[in-house]
Amino acid sequence: MLRGAFIGFGNVAAKGHMPGWRARDDARIVAATDAAASRREAFLAACPDGRWRDSVDDLLFGETLDFVDICAPPGSHAALIERALCAGLHVLSEKPLVTTVEDAKRVAAAAARARRVLHAVHNWLEAPICRKISALIDEGAIGTVRSVRWRTLRTQPAIAVSAEGVTNWRVDPAMAGGGILFDHGWHALYCVMRWAGVPVGAAARLETRRFHEQPLEDTATLDLDTAAGTSNIFLTWAADERSNAIEIEGEDGEIRVVGDALILKSNAREGRWCCPPSLSQGSHHADWFGGVAADFVAAATRNARSNLDEAVLCARLIDAAQRSSAAGGVRVTLAG
């Protein structure tokens, strides 16, 4: 039985992760800490047998642990990951894993030195509709994927639980790392990579269309070049509706996602599946966490592969997108 603890116990931890940990018989949460002391009551209500620790050091060195589940704001991830790895613990971290390429390289090296698992929460791949997409692509239903067209529309940034006196960290550059590119773009990137392959280049434009009082972009447009074609991602917090749409073109057919419906049209067959919930329904996705936890535990106990390489590539692609946008949208090649 693995013993774990939360670093950060906001809504994502309480509503998105905790139900999944409670459902497992091979791992359990025994403690937590958060910069907001007010989260103590919420944690103890969710985990009556758990212990609340007043600091990260108190947690790391005052508990007997096998892993930590980091659900703190992204700007703190790199330092927290390194501290946990240095303490000999496996680490599961919410996305984005880190906020810079340099930090991505550093935590990957730290995991290798510590010989511990570092795994990112790439939970959208566990959504029923995304699992169905992956299965259809893997069985060759549309042949080689040429392009993915991804749309995420939101009307505003999500509100995050913060320490007293701290504003919403999602729109704080120091804590979020970036605007919607980090918040929703990270999900889009690992999904597109899973279906279309690893990009070799990227071009992007980051804009502020509505929330001009905030220092981060509320809209992002990315083109990703792969060996078979070019995929496009559009993300905005400045829409008039909340929705997601996906269109995937293959050499032998296409897959479309509208709401919770998946539609397949190919040379060999056609099909339609209802795969609730839709990607735009809810925010914490507790039902998508089970597969993430299973993969993490398998990596920690049975030497299964973690998704660290995928997470590092997400960081590299976001860096390329930021550099592209700063240069007017020029294409940036990913080396190596």
Q: Model regions: which residues?
A:
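N-terminal Rossmann-like dinucleotide-binding module
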Residues: 1-47
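Active-site loop of classical SDR/Rossmann-like NAD(P)-dependent oxidoreductases
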Residues: 12, 280-294
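C-terminal helix-rich "cap/oligomerization" subdomain common to oxidoreductases
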Residues: 27, 67-72, 105, 116, ...
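Beta-loop-alpha module in the N-terminal Rossmann-like domain of NAD(P)-dependent dehydrogenases
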Residues: 50-110
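Hydrophobic residues in well-ordered beta-strands that form the structural core
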Residues: 54, 93, 118-120, 257
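Rossmann-fold dehydrogenase core element
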Residues: 106-124, 144-147
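Predominantly a Rossmann-like dinucleotide-binding segment in NAD(P)-dependent oxidoreductases
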Residues: 125-205, 210-212
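Contiguous beta-strand/loop segments that form the cofactor/metal-binding neighborhood of enzyme cores
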Residues: 189-261, 290-304, 320, 336
